């Protein structure tokens, strides 16, 4: 019978942050022989690195080239899709079943949790009402688990999971759910995703004086999980996908493409709307990486576009051809050009020059409509003098049945103080691996362990 394991993802935790404010994590690391620094696959973003850890291969093979991409068939950009069918490589639990068909897996909020071969699933899934309301909820497998979790823990705290109010509440709910699911189902593999650090580090930056409190809050939840799992004979493995570094400003590649006459946009009732599929080129911005897809009008201008970005302040690399392949992104979903920002920059999806003409959804939390990742959704616009009153009045209008936008989100990219996505942030600022056998893993030349080694480490822990 395989040894049971729990793979716990402490998003945003880097070796530089482990210390006096994380006593439980630090003690566990000492017990396991120390903290190993992990080298992420490019891009170092949630869905890509999680999938690399679970499959043992990089994006060129598993196909998850970012948190989203432009579909060449539809010409549409889609981020944060959840179907397991998007992953094009076998994942940990299915690989383990080749050795023991009785292996079971519980996925508590890791990505691509829908339509999956996992036995138990808990994943955020809001209810979207026709009148524009977004109701906090989760999707589970089996279906009745949702009702049991809601009765025991309350509804999934969606607005504490992402947005200006994000805090430890969502991480605590996930930890509670993981404990309940493990106790009730005793899975062979338990995956747990704890997002708390991710938001504070992006919002405040890793050097902010409030970060020690965020670390203590996370450490408390990790301590509960470690105590639970070890008492149940489950071997914990701590990982994080990436570390988060300080940033000062953003680069807007779609504005550059627009100024070069390559972006297709039109004015709709005073708002400038873009059509990525019709554009000669469009950049899908994803933290510190942007995938630039070239359309009919852009393919013939590839070298010109590459040179344009290479000369842009804040852009560190423009990958194409053999360089793109060497970076592990030789996949049809990846951009024809892949941009990597400077260490202190990130990419926005913005294409408008006049904020009065931005899309109406830009000042809302709308992760599916925006054709790029937008960490400004963590901020209420500081220009709003009475933010609680502004939000409350809009919520009252919604409750009265009026279709009302919660258009209170900031648009200033300089508010964002932390980002990730690059794979060479500097030692101390990458992801971590803490596990029994981690000390025996082979290093790369820079002393880091590739994140793709996690799958085989997990299998080795299970089967010896």
Where are these regions (language model features)?
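Secreted, luminal/periplasmic, and some membrane-associated catalytic domains
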Residues: 3, 17-20, 36-39, 44-45, ...
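Short, solvent-exposed loop/turn segments at secondary-structure junctions
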Residues: 12-15, 43-44, 59, 110-115, ...
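Histidine-centered active-site/metal-ligand motif
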Residues: 199-204, 242, 420-427
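Beta-strand elements within well-structured catalytic alpha/beta cores of enzymes
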Residues: 2-16, 28, 53, 96, ...
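Short, structured active-site-proximal loop/turn typified by the sulfatase FGly-forming signature C/S-X-P-X-R
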Residues: 16-61, 104-106
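His/Asp/Glu-rich, glycine-adjacent segments
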Residues: 57-205, 217, 279-284, 288-294, ...
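Short glycine/proline-rich, acidic loop/turn segments that cap or connect secondary-structure elements
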Residues: 416-436
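Charged substrate- and nucleic-acid-binding regions of tRNA-handling and nucleotidyl-transfer enzymes
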Residues: 433-447
């Amino acid at each position: 019978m395989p040894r049971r394991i729990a793979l716990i993802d402490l998003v945003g935790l880097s070796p530089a942050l482990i210390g006096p404010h994380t006593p439980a994590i630090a003690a566990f690391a000492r017990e396991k022989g120390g903290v190993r620094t992990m080298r992420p696959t490019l891009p170092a973003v949630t869905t890509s690195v999680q999938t690399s850890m679970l499959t043992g291969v990089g994006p060129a093979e598993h196909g998850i080239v970012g948190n989203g991409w432009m579909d060449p068939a539809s010409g549409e950009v889609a981020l944060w899709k959840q179907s397991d069918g998007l992953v094009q490589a076998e994942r940990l639990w299915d690989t383990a079943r080749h050795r023991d068909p009785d292996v079971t897996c519980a996925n508590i909020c890791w990505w691509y949790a829908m339509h999956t071969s996992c036995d138990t699933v808990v994943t955020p899934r809001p209810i979207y009402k026709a009148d524009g309301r977004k109701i906090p909820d989760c999707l589970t497998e089996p279906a009745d688990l949702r009702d049991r979790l809601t009765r025991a823990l309350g509804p999934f705290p969606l607005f504490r999971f992402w947005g200006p109010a994000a805090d430890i509440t969502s991480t605590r709910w996930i930890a509670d759910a993981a404990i309940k699911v493990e106790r009730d189902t005793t899975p062979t593999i338990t995956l747990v995703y704890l997002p708390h650090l991710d938001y504070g580090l992006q919002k405040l930056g890793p050097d902010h004086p409030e970060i020690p409190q965020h670390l203590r809050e996370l450490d408390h939840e990790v301590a509960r999980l470690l105590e639970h799992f070890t008492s149940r004979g489950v071997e914990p493995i701590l990982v994080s996908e990436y570390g988060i570094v300080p940033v000062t400003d953003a680069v807007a590649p779609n504005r550059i493409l627009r100024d070069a006459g390559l972006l297709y946009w039109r004015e709709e009732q005073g708002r400038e709307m873009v059509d990525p599929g019709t554009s000669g080129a469009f950049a899908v911005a994803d933290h510190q990486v942007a995938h630039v897809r070239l359309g009919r009008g852009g393919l013939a201008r590839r070298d010109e576009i590459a040179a344009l970005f290479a000369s842009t302040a804040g852009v560190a690399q423009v990958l194409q051809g053999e360089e793109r392949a060497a970076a592990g992104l030789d996949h049809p979903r990846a951009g024809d050009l892949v941009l990597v920002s400077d260490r202190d920059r990130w990419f926005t999806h913005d294409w408008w020059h006049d904020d009065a003409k931005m899309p109406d959804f830009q000042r809302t939390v709308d992760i599916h409509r925006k054709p790029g990742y937008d960490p400004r959704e963590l901020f209420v616009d500081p220009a709003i003098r009475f933010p609680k009153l502004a939000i409350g009045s809009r919520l009252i209008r919604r409750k009265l049945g009026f279709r009302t936008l919660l258009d209170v989100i900031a648009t200033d990219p300089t508010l964002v103080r932390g980002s990730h996505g690059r794979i060479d942030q500097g030692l101390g600022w990458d992801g971590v691996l803490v596990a029994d056998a981690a000390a025996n893993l082979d290093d790369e030349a820079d002393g880091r362990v590739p994140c793709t080694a996690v799958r085989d480490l997990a299998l080795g822990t299970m089967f010896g």
